Amino acid sequence: MHFKFFAVTAALSLAAAASAQTASQPPVFTPEAFRSHVAFLGDDLLEGRDAGSRGYELGALYVATQFEGLGLKPGGADGWYQQVPFLQHKLVDGAGSVTIGGKSFANRSAVLVAPSPIEGAQAVEAPVVFVGYGIDSTALGMDDYKGLDVKGKIVAMFGGTPKGLPSDVAAHTNSDKRRMAAAKGAVGIIMLRSAEESARRPWARMTQGGNDPALTWLGPDGQPFSAAPGIRARATLDTPAAEALFAGAPRSFAQIQAEAATKGPIKGFALKPKVRIDQTSSVTRTTSPNVLGIIPGSDPALANEYVLLMAHLDGLGVHEAEGDDKIHNGAMDNSTGVATLLEVARAMQESGNRPKRSILLAAVTAEEDGLQGAQYLARNPVLGDGKVVGVVNLDMPVLLYDFQDVIAFGAEHSTMGKFVESAAAKIGIKLSGDPLPQEGLFTRSDHYRFVQEGIPAVFLMTGFANGGEEKFTGFLGTDYHKPTDDLKLPFDWKAGAKFAQINYLIASEIANAPEAPRWYSDSFFGKTLAPKAAKATR
């Protein structure tokens, strides 16, 4: 196995060197080069590249040696690596329960209890306040906590947001609700399921994941990071437990569900039963690296401004509960993204024209565990006096067809959209709107961790034109996050080369532009996450 790894690495390094372009010639993107990266990273040898596993370490070594062979500079304090320390935590034997007014519900019956990064038995008992959707946002004019005292209490809320918000704003707001609850002084969160969510995702599917461990990265003080300090317990309730929680309330759970289906914000109120959430977690420490390489900028005035190109290297690993094929190879998700990253790096090095701004290339860990590696990189920068001014994220292009259009998530919020338009036009690619707004994709990949820090970002998805809808949705329904996401899929490797080319053009335009990317003055994300940053007008 080691022989196979080093033989492939050496062969690809020689191939990269042999294909060097004459200075100033436009770089060539080939299906063969793109496929070579996916073929290695998606091989059974890497066992699905789960963060912290040996397979992931092999993938990280592959990327690092590719960076070295291309002549990049190491970007981490540990050479090519930024080691990310993690706590891996899970419920002991799946143990956990929620007691509502004296009635106990075992974990996975009608409740799901979240593990804690604090080892040992934990219990949180407190009164409960229903807070509607649990949103407190001045920017949106919403305050579900108005008139409610939740300090020291558990808050119960519906997932999601009221209807009518733009999909990306809704997804961001939903992801920020833990922080909002903590800011109000709550000690626990109970998530309720709307009738729509229950129909879309039955409880049996909610409990399929078993007792998979969660990851939380550790800060410099050795403590687990939390965006919601003070929240000590979390649980999700199915309908029987939710009905018990609303016993004796001014409105029943069924009435509240009906309101959620038809109305905007829902007025909250205190609930009668006291609730106790019990769980016992085991904790182990592990590390997993982000792999970082740098192409220094050629303009001394701009070289401290970095364009970040990022792709997650991790996958889902090996799942013993699966059938004969237990390995989640992650060929599409996200060997293709890493292949794009490597091909863009090669093209930039071989073009003979260094970009004016510097380029930080990052293959990050633990995306599948909640965008953890990207968040660690965003909050633990490696650039000294330099700063990231824009992010181009590369995550799971579905390469089963000759795509003719792309969706550029985030493009409408900043001047990065102009670079995407220009790059796409150069190779005859059209831009399309989001065909899957219900998925909230803008907040579900690594670039979002930099958006949260106030940095503009774009993330390209292959579009639905030219038969793409059938191929894309078919992959999501049949192969996404399954062992069948492997090299047996009918990849269109020419599409992979084209995807690398468009991202190369986008990154190059950003890196060589007179001005760094700016949020638009009317962008929700610019106003709320980068209020002091200079803005652009449309």
Q: Where are the predicted features?
A:
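Noncatalytic luminal/extracellular "stalk/propeptide" segments of secretory-pathway proteins
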Residues: 47-155, 159-163, 271, 283, ...
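His/Asp/Glu-rich mid-to-C-terminal helical/loop segments that flank catalytic regions of hydrolases
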Residues: 346, 350, 461, 467-529
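Bacterial N-terminal signal peptides that target proteins for export
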Residues: 1-7
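Bacterial N-terminal signal peptides
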Residues: 7-17
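Soluble metallo-hydrolase cores and metallopeptidase-like ectodomains found primarily
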Residues: 104-147, 224-330, 346, 350
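Second-shell loop/turn segments in exported
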Residues: 22-28, 44-54, 69, 96, ...
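Metal-dependent peptidase/peptidase-like ectodomains
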Residues: 103-108, 216-253, 364-471, 476
